[in-house]
A protein has these predicted regions:
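Conserved RecA-like P-loop NTPase ATPase core
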Residues: 88, 109, 146
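Conserved S-adenosyl-L-methionine
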Residues: 108-110, 137
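Extended basic-aromatic, gly/pro-enriched interface segments that bind polyanionic ligands
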Residues: 129-157
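Conserved AdoMet
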Residues: 1-105
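Conserved SAM-binding loop of SAM-dependent methyltransferases across substrates and taxa
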Residues: 111-128
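Alpha-helical elements of the RecA-like P-loop NTPase motor core of helicases
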Residues: 86, 116, 144
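Short, well-ordered alpha-helices that flank and scaffold nucleotide-derived cofactor binding pockets
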Residues: 90, 120-124, 148
Length: 157
């Protein structure tokens, strides 16, 4: 496996910050190498510098998205932030009492547990009143899992 120089790692730090607003500390160097090493192999590249050049060439948007997917960490589970859902219940109940439609956008929704948690709260609080939940994420890989809506029991803590 190729090793990554400090200069190469610094380029990837800038890349993921520019692409996703994610700051990778120096402690994440091993993680980055582990996640991207198979991409070097897949393209027959010998260095992380070569892989970075591929990403910057502007000729492979799919590979850029793959790199972003690999460098994002997606940890989530149902009802992960209880206080947020308590607040949502209050706001939704107020909107329901005024017969207003309700729309929630879950940015950085990862694999969708938050979206489905929001939907459960809105279904409970708003019943037949109109409501909608929209989820988005920079990682197309996790959005695919969110669309499937199948989760292991461990995601419900």
């Amino acid at each position: 496996m190729s090793t990554i120089s400090d200069a190469e790692f610094s380029r990837f730090q800038r890349f993921i910050y520019d692409a996703a607003g994610i700051t990778l500390s120096a402690a994440k160097k091993t993680m980055l190498c582990g996640r991207l090493s198979k991409r070097l192999q897949a393209h027959g590249l010998v260095s992380y510098g070569d892989y970075f050049a591929l990403l910057q060439s502007g000729t492979n948007a799919v590979e850029v998205q793959t790199a972003v997917d690999l460098l994002t960490t997606n940890e989530t589970y149902f009802f992960r932030e209880p206080k947020h859902f308590d607040l949502l219940r209050k706001i939704a109940a107020d909107a329901g009492s005024r017969a207003q439609s309700f729309r929630v956008w879950s940015a950085a929704c990862s694999t969708g547990e938050e979206c489905y948690s929001i939907a459960m709260v809105l279904a409970d609080c708003l019943g037949n009143s109109p409501w909608e939940v929209v989820g988005s994420d920079i990682s197309t890989r996790v959005l695919q899992r969110a669309r499937q809506g199948h989760y292991p029991d461990a995601r419900a803590r």
